[in-house]
Amino acid sequence: MRILIVRLSAMGDVIHALPALTDLRRALPDAHITMAVDERFADIVRLHSGVDRVMAIALKRWKGQPTAMQTWREIKAALHALRQQRYDLALDLHGLNKSAALIWLARAGLKIGPHPSLCGEWLASKACERHGLPEQAHLPVPRMRGLLALALKQELGGPADFGLRHAWQGAASKDVVLLHGTSAAHKLWPESHWIETGCFLIAQGLRPVLAWGSAAEHERAVRLAQAMGPQAVVAPPCSILQWAEQLARCRLVIGVDTGLTHLAAASAVPCIALFVGTSARLFTPQEPRWARSLDGGGQSPAAEQVHTAAQELLAMS
């Protein structure tokens, strides 16, 4: 059986789709599974042992260079890769026009997508022949797992398993990765809280490692590290695969609602997730006992709350 799964972005949502892939592999161990994903997050899917083929789609880059010949060559190659084989099932886990376009173009015997009420764009529901409205549809992991269960007509229960290859091995490490950056300003935690937390960690004999992924985040990381003192370091530039390895080797992760925080939680790394402008209900760690989510209810969680949670997790590890 050949199955196409489409979940293009964003990073956290691609991570939240991984338990559905684990469910699919367990339900159909002999199936050939292809996943279409934004090229920026393709390496996340490659970390999952249950995917046979990753189809990297460069939509954002193509959109930025619409008249370039290279763009059109890549689009042609992507369409060929999509249509070169026939699928028994194509499943849209995204529910937007861009994912629906891939489902519509795919040569699949059955095309299933989210219920129209779950689709972010009106046309997105028109590409599929059947639609699913799973229970807990407002939460990403249960929604995508539930949609798969409805597609397979099977009960797929149990705890979410992200199926990532990197196992945590940082119990002896002194590094605590601080994920302060996010693409949405309403998710940011105050810099004063980061500085206070960095100083707290240093007092515990630990080393704050400040991650970054853009020029603005690098400037903030340098600024925070300087305020914390010489023990704090700014991380070098890293790919997603390099971050997956680094997170697996650190003692603890503290991060806002951003992709790498969800990657750490999905990898069973001890993790504190800070939810400022979003809901902690979105947080689904692989090992709940090694994770804490602090929801400020639209406000910033206090630094003291983070310190208490850090002490709890450090004592356990």
Indicate residue ranges for each PLM-predicted region.
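Catalytic machinery of carbohydrate-active enzymes
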Residues: M1-S317
